[in-house]
Amino acid sequence: MDHLPIFCQLRHRACLLVGGGDVAERKARLLLEAGAALTVNALAFAPQFKAWAKQGMLRLVQGEFNASLLDDCWLAIAATDDDAVNNQVSEAAEARRIFCNVVDAPKQASFIMPSIIDRSPLMVAISSGGTSPVLARLLREKLEALLPQHLGKVAGYAGQLRRRVKQTFTSMSERRRFWEKFFVNDRLAQSLANDDEQAVTRITETLLSEPLDDRGEVVLVGAGPGDPGLLTLKGLQQIQQADIVVYDRLVSDEIMNLVRRDADRVFVGKRAGYHCVPQEEINQILLREAQRGKRVVRLKGGDPFIFGRGGEELETLCDAGIPFSVVPGITAASGCSAYAGLPLTHRDYAQSVRLITGHLKNGGEFDWHNLAAEKQTLVFYMGLNQAAAIQEKLIEHGMDPQMPVALVENGTSVKQRVVAGVLTELGALAQRVESPSLIIVGRVVALRDKLNWFSSK
């Protein structure tokens, strides 16, 4: 380890920044956020420095660097475009045993500035030791996506509760269990983010007063249509907090690779070598694991409330008194149509869109007359086996036999394939694709060649 990570308390402590340009301005902003008593020395200053000085936030010393400016300083930063001046500052600081950072010259510096993720009071610092600042920045961007913006409020509120929690729960194990429930309580986190004091108080009192049983919870998460980049940030956060993930065939391998490595995985879909797990058995798996105290994520392709049976699963949990929450996902109709260059609505072609399941319960029948109307787009989920019947019924009820149609196979993934034609060909086209595929019927399909942007294998 070439550098020891430390966090400095600089509030009201004297610090010197040498430089008055854009780079120095960025360093000044960080020092001011940390509460430093900042002096800035330069031959000339960018306008922002003058504005800060006018507000009394820092002191400006215009002119050549003089080592006496380091007197009584705790920390210094050299951020000029003159290597000789930067070296002069570094040597003067070293002689006084003052830590000094030299921008873009880590070998001359006694400390380096990391990339920072600020969720005050929670702080995350990332450094490559000065060898690759771009890599550190890219890692910071990835972590920024994982850490919710409201995390700082949660951490700050936890600090306020520490004494009361210690008084309420006498044993270390009880306090640990309380904090585990506290930090994964999504309702509390959202209430803190919204500054909803009444809700925060109500949830806190419930957490403090209810028995510390081993009851877990279930989070229903929509994984989106396939491309892992379309998984929502909240969905990603939830699957990385899960003790167990119950998933089906429509969840891509790329998304499953994002699951916490030590989490249990239970596959409940249907594919080669596996039998489809009945819905009632899935419901019982969720219930059983939550009753064991697990944080369960039920991960479904697309959006769990659009032909995903999410409501059925939650009813079982609700009846059993198991806490649950829902993270919506991008449904297949939205994701697959976008990646296939097919706008679902368009002023000239479609003023509405209908999402339709290819499976009706107990032999039910669609309202084919209204489905055959113009100026709309039809999207059939799970409709491959019914494609010939869909073709026949739509034509029978008056739809133009030359209505454009498209089938999107493995939409949004690198395996995406789009097969297009007209309504009279729908049954035959369905024989050329495999599940999972989406059927799209409407005039908007004619725009595909013009609007297609996604390159796939």
UniProtKB/Swiss-Prot annotation:
Region of interest called Uroporphyrinogen-III C-methyltransferase, as start-end residue ranges on this chain: 216-457
Catalytic residues identified in the record: 248, 270
GO process terms (BP): cobalamin biosynthetic process; methylation; siroheme biosynthetic process
InterPro entries in alphabetical order: 4pyrrol_Mease (IPR000878), 4pyrrol_Methylase_sf (IPR035996), 4pyrrole_Mease_sub1 (IPR014777), 4pyrrole_Mease_sub2 (IPR014776), CobA/CysG_C (IPR006366), NAD(P)-bd_dom_sf (IPR036291), Siro_Cobalamin_biosynth (IPR050161), Sirohaem_synt_dimer_dom_sf (IPR037115)
Residue ranges of coiled coil: none
Binding residue positions for S-adenosyl-L-methionine: 225, 301-303, 306, 331-332, 382, 411
Record's catalysed reaction(s): uroporphyrinogen III + 2 S-adenosyl-L-methionine = precorrin-2 + 2 S-adenosyl-L-homocysteine + H(+); precorrin-2 + NAD(+) = sirohydrochlorin + NADH + 2 H(+); siroheme + 2 H(+) = sirohydrochlorin + Fe(2+)
Pathway assignment: Cofactor biosynthesis; adenosylcobalamin biosynthesis; precorrin-2 from uroporphyrinogen III: step 1/1; Cofactor biosynthesis; adenosylcobalamin biosynthesis; sirohydrochlorin from precorrin-2: step 1/1; Porphyrin-containing compound metabolism; siroheme biosynthesis; precorrin-2 from uroporphyrinogen III: step 1/1; Porphyrin-containing compound metabolism; siroheme biosynthesis; siroheme from sirohydrochlorin: step 1/1
Renumbered residue ranges of the record's region Precorrin-2 dehydrogenase /sirohydrochlorin ferrochelatase: 1-204
Binding site for NAD(+): 22-23, 43-44
Keywords noted in UniProt: Cobalamin biosynthesis, Lyase, Methyltransferase, Multifunctional enzyme, NAD, Oxidoreductase, Phosphoprotein, Porphyrin biosynthesis, S-adenosyl-L-methionine, Transferase
This protein's record includes keyword Coiled coil: no
Modified residue annotations for Phosphoserine: 128
Molecular functions (GO terms): NAD binding; precorrin-2 dehydrogenase activity; sirohydrochlorin ferrochelatase activity; uroporphyrin-III C-methyltransferase activity
EC number per UniProt: 2.1.1.107, 1.3.1.76, 4.99.1.4
Family: In the N-terminal section; belongs to the precorrin-2 dehydrogenase / sirohydrochlorin ferrochelatase family.
Matches recorded under HAMAP family: Siroheme_synth
Listed NCBIfam families: cobA_cysG_Cterm (TIGR01469), cysG_Nterm (TIGR01470), PRK06136.1 (NF004790), PRK10637.1 (NF007922)
Function: Then it catalyzes the NAD-dependent ring dehydrogenation of precorrin-2 to yield sirohydrochlorin. Finally, it catalyzes the ferrochelation of sirohydrochlorin to yield siroheme.
Name of the molecule in the record: Siroheme synthase 2
